[in-house]
Amino acid sequence: DVQAIEVNLRQGGTTHPYMALCALTTGRLDPASGLFLTPTGEALHYQATDNLCDERLRGLLPIDLIDIVAEAGLHYDPARLRGSVFHLLGCLSEFGKLGMTSIGRDDEEADAVFQATVERLLAGASQRRSASLDQLMLAGR
């Protein structure tokens, strides 16, 4: 029986990214290689954080986050075995904080998905915030 261990060189580390990978793919760790494999034998990698925090995310609703990421094609797609999934959404609107796991077929793809998701999420949040302020200003006239 192989158990996964995640080394977090910080306080408060979690196994959420590994558990998300397991739940999304029904894959497993291969004891011989140490790689996470899908049921069809494809290796998957992830990059994750439980502390994506930015002032631009404050006031954003979880449905807005999903819309922004889905419109950019960065949500997790089981057919492509790549994309981002989110947790800690209860902290999003009030604190501008969330957790995210980005999955790819190798380290480079997981990192590229992660970086693209952060970039698009922050840009989309800024655009939505600006549009909301414009609506408030128009309503006040």
Predicted features, each with a name:
Residues 1-141:
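ATP-dependent carboxylate activation and anion-phosphoryl transfer catalytic cores
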